[in-house]
């Protein structure tokens, strides 16, 4: 078992997951996560620009600092509404050591950072097929966290997709060795090959089910994180296997109405988790939105 594992009976995430899997879902069991792992993608820009500044600007005093980012996390944790806070390994460790997490919220750490999330200013990595990569060390992470996010991207590109699946297999073996649970993020293709846009939802659904068909219960993800590809696509996946709890990612920033409309449509179509990052961070009042 992970060294960081605590009594899960008080964690709202595990309480809700158990109710959902038992077929006793109610709207109050919808799981809310704040994805504050943007430092793994955007570097200095992770916490966002200061008022009046632009996300593409450069220079000192333009972006919020790491300390401010951590303070944002402490404030949203203290609010007591979230079930999960997702961070980078370094920030998760800091929150744990500072005893900022409390008893009810679950800390999750990004377990890999494939190339399609690399977004430095001036960079162009997402224009190339996703390549698997992981900075984080699960052995070290297990000392303070027992839940990690693992992400995959399929592009209908045989060589790259095989590497993606092989890396996921290796990750699962390491996670089992160190007693770490995971949830699985499957992005839409970032450089799709011979794939029509209207096929994206079914392509992703089939890849998820196919990839997990050979994974036994001990290694299966606790839930999924995918893009919302329409109600029919989400309903197809959520109805296919009740043991797969499906969650949606928030994507880019939007209006408050956009956020609640997405939540409504997702839940109606079988979604049971929302993992929002920029939609919370760039809201006019992040705490009120949560």
Predicted regions, residues:
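C-terminal helical cap(s) of enzyme catalytic domains, especially alpha/beta-barrels
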Residues: 267, 281-290
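Active-site glycine- and acidic-residue-rich loops that bind
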Residues: 11, 156-166, 253-255
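Alpha-helix-loop-beta-strand connector modules within alpha/beta enzyme cores
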Residues: 97-118, 164-178, 202-209, 234-253, ...
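Glycine-enriched alpha-helix->loop->beta-strand junction motifs that scaffold or abut catalytic
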Residues: 81, 102-106, 217-220, 239-247, ...
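Conserved, mostly hydrophobic/aromatic
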Residues: 185, 277
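Alpha/beta catalytic barrel-like cores
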Residues: 1-156
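Catalytic beta/alpha-barrel core
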Residues: 84-90, 108-110, 151-164, 181-183, ...
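Short secondary-structure boundary segments
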Residues: 89, 250-251, 278
